Structures are given as structure tokens and as C-alpha cells.
């Protein structure tokens, strides 16, 4: 059961559809308060039963696998055209080591190359770090290019250590990664 008080002061609700009913409840409360919705569509996670959650979101950051299954296309441009429909304000399709592609509703887009993790130790949590870093930039009203670069760089840094929270570890309290 979603507790509406969790949205007090929120500017964005980030959902992934994993707990569908809770996500729907949270989404309804966020919509009633005009809170922006972001959606995380991970690889292997698309299901028709969560399409409504995806389609209600404003900021859509999804893996290429999710984008292909949700759009029914394997062509990147065709996928984007289908997935950037209103109310979307932004679409990001991630491709891991091949970087990410960022689209605006007017169909302008760019490719953000991935940063190389050296050494590459563990990719656990890199997608979550990418999402969090990108959304930090989005909420800070950074240019999209800066959001994408920052997210890509921070995700690569996460892969240089063990576990999904490497970049948040006490051994590395600050990362001078802002561009």
C-alpha cells in the first residue's frame, strides 16, 4: 500500500513497474499533485501489464531491450518515435557499453557515448546509478547533454568497484564529476 505522505515536497516520482499496484497507486497520487513521473524500464522487464505506467510517465529512461519490446520495433528512430509520445518530455534509451540515446519530443536527439570503466569490476547497479545521476541533473535543470554525460560517467565509476553502491561508498565520499 502506497503512503501518500511520501510525496510531500516531492518534485518527481520514479517508478519501474515492479510492484504494479503500488506503482499505480503512487502514480495516481503524484498525478493529482502535478508531480512529474519518471519511468525506469530495465532489460527483460517489459510486460504489457505495465504499459500504462510507462505511458503515464514524463521522463522515460529505458534499456534498448525494453524499448524494442514496448515499441515493437528494432529500429532506433522508429522506437523513439513510438515511445516519445505525450505526456513524455524526455526519452533515453540505454545500451550499456554502447552509451545512450536521448530524445526530446521535437525528435531532436543525440548519442552519449559510454565512459570506460578502468578497471571493470562489477556492473551491478550501474543502471540505477545512471538513472539517479540523470534525474539529479534533470531536476537541477542542467542541459540534457550534461545530464547524460554525468550519468554515463558516474555509472562507469560504479563499475570500477564491487557492488551496486560503489560510488556511494565511504571510501569515495566525493566524486568530482560535475561537468
Predicted features along the sequence, with ranges:
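Conserved phosphate-binding/catalytic region of the ribokinase-like
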Residues: 12, 74-179
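Ribokinase/PfkB-type carbohydrate-kinase core domain
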Residues: 1-110, 142, 170
Amino acid at each position: 500500500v502506497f503512503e501518500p505522505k511520501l510525496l510531500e515536497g516531492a518534485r518527481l516520482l520514479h517508478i519501474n513497474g515492479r510492484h504494479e499496484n503500488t506503482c499505480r497507486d503512487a502514480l495516481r497520487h503524484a498525478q493529482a499533485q502535478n508531480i512529474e513521473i519518471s519511468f525506469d524500464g530495465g532489460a527483460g522487464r517489459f510486460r504489457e501489464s505495465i504499459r500504462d505506467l510507462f505511458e503515464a510517465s514524463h521522463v522515460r529512461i529505458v534499456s534498448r531491450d525494453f524499448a524494442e519490446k514496448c515499441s515493437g520495433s528494432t529500429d532506433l528512430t522508429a522506437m523513439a518515435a513510438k515511445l516519445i509520445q505525450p505526456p513524455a518530455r524526455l526519452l533515453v534509451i540505454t545500451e550499456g557499453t554502447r552509451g545512450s540515446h536521448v530524445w526530446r519530443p521535437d525528435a531532436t536527439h543525440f548519442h552519449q557515448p559510454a565512459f570506460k570503466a578502468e578497471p571493470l569490476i562489477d556492473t551491478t547497479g550501474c543502471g540505477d546509478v545512471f538513472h539517479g545521476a540523470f534525474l539529479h541533473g534533470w531536476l537541477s535543470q542542467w542541459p540534457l547533454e550534461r545530464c547524460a554525460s554525468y550519468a554515463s560517467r558516474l555509472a562507469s565509476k560504479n563499475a570500477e568497484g564491487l557492488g551496486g553502491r560503489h560510488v556511494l561508498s565511504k571510501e569515495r565520499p566525493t566524486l568530482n564529476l560535475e561537468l
